[in-house]
């Protein structure tokens, strides 16, 4: 069964820029998919459509069989957790309070506004922190953590939501290589253990090849590759990193180093 269905989707912004051009794809439940491509390829726009942060100009996006639109957006977003490049934590709050914000979609409007959580929520938050190895940091301020630790808090917040899908937008772009490896391994473990569908935007080819079940390569708003890591050849990478008929030499050289 498809966790995510994208049918004939285009996205055109008011300035006329067409970020996505006729995207058709299905992402299977419980799979780990990496969307790979250079900056400006449309990767982030695609993820934002999956969570209703953007709306398609044409076409439809469905999560768990439900169309992502304004009518049931809160309900759909409760199924879809986001992990962000810049962590999106409230730095002055404690780690556990940041994780608890993952429960807001399960609370009433009043509870969301006033950060009213139940004892059950606190238990879920503590369990999520244990999963990411940060139990001892629960009452520390978020801004006292390292970048890798802050991203672990972001993942714990996603887990606390009890989602069916986790969307991670360049989750390791600002991390060192060791932390990047640890974060990708953690997302992979969550996918395997919990059966949560994970979609990750990356530009690191080596990480994509090591952790993904499937790689979707994008260039200039189109899907130009769709296959397994073993099928990601040097020629496929050239197609992904070609820019308006000219190869993006810096990105391509880095990509080919891991082909």
Swiss-Prot record:
Chemical reaction(s) catalysed: phosphonate(out) + ATP + H2O = phosphonate(in) + ADP + phosphate + H(+)
Query: EC number(s) on record?
Result: 7.3.2.2
- Which residues are ATP-binding? 37-44
Q: According to its UniProt record, where is this protein located? A: Cell inner membrane
Q: What class of enzyme is it?
A: translocase
Chain segments annotated as transmembrane: none
Q: How is this protein situated with respect to the membrane?
A: Peripheral membrane protein
* InterPro entries for this protein: AAA+_ATPase, ABC_transporter-like_ATP-bd, ABC_transporter-like_CS, ABC_transpr_PhnC, MetN_ABC_transporter-like, P-loop_NTPase
Transport is among the record's keywords = yes
How does this polypeptide assemble, per the annotation? The complex is composed of two ATP-binding proteins (PhnC), two transmembrane proteins (PhnE) and a solute-binding protein (PhnD).
Q: What is this protein called?
A: Phosphonates import ATP-binding protein PhnC
Task: Give the species.
Answer: Thiobacillus denitrificans (strain ATCC 25259 / T1)
């Amino acid at each position: 069964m498809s966790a995510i269905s994208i049918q004939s989707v285009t996205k055109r912004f008011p300035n006329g820029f067409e970020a996505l051009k006729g995207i058709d794809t299905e992402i299977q439940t419980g799979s780990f998919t990496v969307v790979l491509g250079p900056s400006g390829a449309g990767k982030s726009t695609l993820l934002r459509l999956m969570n209703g942060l953007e709306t398609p100009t044409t076409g439809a996006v469905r999560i768990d069989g439900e169309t992502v639109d304004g009518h049931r957006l809160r309900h759909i977003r409760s199924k879809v957790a986001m992990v962000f490049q810049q962590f999106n934590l409230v730095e002055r709050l404690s780690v556990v309070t940041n994780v608890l914000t993952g429960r807001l979609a399960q609370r009433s409007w009043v509870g969301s506004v006033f950060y009213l959580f139940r004892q059950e929520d606190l238990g879920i938050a503590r369990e999520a922190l244990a999963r990411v190895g940060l139990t001892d940091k629960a009452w520390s301020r978020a801004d006292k953590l390292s970048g890798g630790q802050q991203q672990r808090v972001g993942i714990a917040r996603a887990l606390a939501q009890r989602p069916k899908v986790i969307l991670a937008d360049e989750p390791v772009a600002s991390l060192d290589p060791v932390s990047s490896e640890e974060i990708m391994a953690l997302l992979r473990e969550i996918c395997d253990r919990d059966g949560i569908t994970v979609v990750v935007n990356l530009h690191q080819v080596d990480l994509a090849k090591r952790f993904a079940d499937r790689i979707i390569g994008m260039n200039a708003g189109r899907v130009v590759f769709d296959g397994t890591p073993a099928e990601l050849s040097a020629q496929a990478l050239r197609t992904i990193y070609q820019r308006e008929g000219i190869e993006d030499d810096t990105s391509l050289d880095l990509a080919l180093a891991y082909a």
